[in-house]
Swiss-Prot record:
Species: Klebsiella pneumoniae subsp. pneumoniae (strain ATCC 700721 / MGH 78578)
Name of the protein: Protein FdhE homolog
Keyword presence, Cytoplasm: yes
Gene3D superfamilies given in the database record: FdhE-like domain
Gene Ontology MF terms in the entry: ferric iron binding
Family assignment from sequence similarity: Belongs to the FdhE family.
Gene: fdhE
GO biological process: one example: protein maturation
Residues making up the signal peptide according to the UniProt record: none
């Protein structure tokens, strides 16, 4: 099954009535996203061996919140939605969408917001980024989008990605269409931008019990049924791992068929779980999965692979 975004004027009346039965997509709601993430990161840092890094990530998330409101994005995506729908492609496809200079503005604003909070190596990194040319910034963005992590140092990548993610999330929040589930390609990539998930969440509330994968770039969430590998769609050899007990709010879902795993979080166990923060705070579980021979099928926006990984 794949998910395709349909222009509003192309939805039939029956589709409009049933569109909310099981929403295939949950577009980003930016009003409280970054503040909530920053708060969760700070909370998780209290008793975590990676506490300092979680607090560092919280500073970036808070800066994203500030910059979001300082630099709103105005854009009409109607034509792009229509063209993408006709081509069967994600409307904000990271591999073909032209990037404008808005994301450069976001990056420099993030740097300005973060400089007073940074010191030592982190300060040196953002000062180096501040001096980078537009061409250098574009080269780093393009490298990250094709997973060429050897071309972008792992200390620069989170800052570059924070600006790109904010830009793509702003665009995704403006999409004037609905989503429709269709037979076709797999759902391992985001239907809005084509990027990878960071983790998945089994939700509460109006989407009680439904699993949604959370995009690590545009912050969109898309529905994937439970007890099925989100990477290869097989269901015969799935196992669930946790560091605590069977009632843990954060687990790793491993697939013996493709040899990968993805974190799955349960809001019914802890309503405060957050896709990025709780994934980053459970890196010990990642280490365990690596020991068991599984490869991660997702990337956290604050933890990019280094050269040679």
């Amino acid at each position: 099954m794949s998910i395709r975004i349909i222009p509003q004027d192309e939805l039939g009346s029956s589709e409009k009535r049933t569109a909310e039965a099981i929403p295939p997509l949950l577009f980003p709601r930016l009003k409280n996203l970054y503040n909530r993430r920053a708060e969760r990161l700070r909370e998780l840092a209290a008793n975590n061996p990676l506490g300092d890094y979680l607090r560092f990530a919280a500073l970036i998330a808070h800066a994203q919140e500030v910059v979001l409101y300082d630099h709103p994005l105005q854009m009409d995506l109607t034509a792009r939605i229509k063209a993408a729908s006709e081509q069967g492609k994600p409307p904000l496809d990271i591999h073909v969408l032209p990037r404008d200079k808005h994301w450069h503005k976001l990056l420099h604003s993030l740097i300005a917001e973060l400089k007073p909070e940074m010191s030592g190596p982190a300060l040196a990194v953002i000062e180096n980024l501040e001096k980078a040319s537009e061409q250098e910034l574009e080269q780093m963005a393009s490298a990250l989008f094709v997973s060429d992590f050897a071309s972008v140092s792992s200390d620069k990548a989170p800052f570059i990605w924070a600006a790109l993610s904010l830009y793509w999330a702003q665009m995704a929040s403006l999409i004037p269409g609905k989503a429709r589930a269709e037979y076709g390609e797999q759902r391992q990539f985001c239907p809005v931008c084509g990027s990878m998930p960071v983790s998945s969440i089994v939700q509460i509330g109006t989407t009680q019990g439904l699993r949604y994968l959370h995009c690590n770039l545009c912050e969109t969430e898309w529905h994937v049924v439970r007890v099925k590998c989100s990477n290869c769609e097989q269901s015969r050899d799935l196992h669930y791992w946790s560091l605590d007990n069977e009632q843990a709010a954060v687990k790793a879902e491993s697939c013996g068929d493709c040899g990968t795993y993805l974190k799955i979080m349960y809001q019914e166990k802890d309503p405060k779980v957050e896709a990025v923060a709780d994934d980053l705070a459970s890196l010990v579980l990642d280490a365990r999965m690596e020991q068991e021979g599984f490869a991660r099928s997702s990337i956290n926006p604050f933890m990019f692979p280094g050269e040679g990984e």
